[in-house]
Amino acid sequence: MATRIRLQRHGRKSYAFYSIVIADSRAPRDGKFTEKIGTYNPNTNPATVDLNFERALHWVLVGAQPSDTVRNILSREGVYMKKHLLGGVAKGAFGEAEAEAKFEAWKNNKQSGLSALKAKEEEAKKAEAKARLEAEKKVNEVKAKALAEKKAAEEAAKAAAEAPAEEAAPAEEAATEAAAE
């Protein structure tokens, strides 16, 4: 039986997530499968992978061929690194304890790189939010200044309209007094 490790699609339109399954290569994509070894959700950032490491390693060791995407997932999770190290142990290049130490060192290095990437993304988000807030403050200051100028112009126009009316009122009173005399 030609066994494949591949993705089985689930989810709604434009929002797919996948099960990582062991299936016969002749079976339909979403059809019959031998074993489910994990899930893959590419919609999150970074993509979420939940994988049964031991079963994935077992199937790779017995010769199951992964699809391109699954090969990348298994490589990122360390299944292929572990297979490589177990091959070195089988050849007698080094011991199993040394292989475990190398694998743990590789895994820790991978985790530190991932955490640094997440921290960098978080810092970029904070900087972007701060820049957006500063830009909004500047726009609000310009709007407030324009509004204050408009109110000052209205007050000046209102004061100018009242001043001639006040000057005209005493002149009218004087004219009425002169006519009365």
From Swiss-Prot:
Disulfide topology: none
Protein family membership: Belongs to the bacterial ribosomal protein bS16 family.
Stretch list, region Disordered: 150-181
Keywords for the protein's UniProt record, in alphabetical order: Ribonucleoprotein, Ribosomal protein
Source domain of life: Bacteria
Alphabetical list of HAMAP family matching this protein: Ribosomal_bS16 (MF_00385)
Cellular component aspect of the GO annotation: cytoplasm; small ribosomal subunit
Protein name, per record: Small ribosomal subunit protein bS16
GO biological process, one term: translation
InterPro entries on file: Ribosomal_bS16, Ribosomal_bS16_dom_sf
A UniProt-annotated Pfam family: Ribosomal_S16
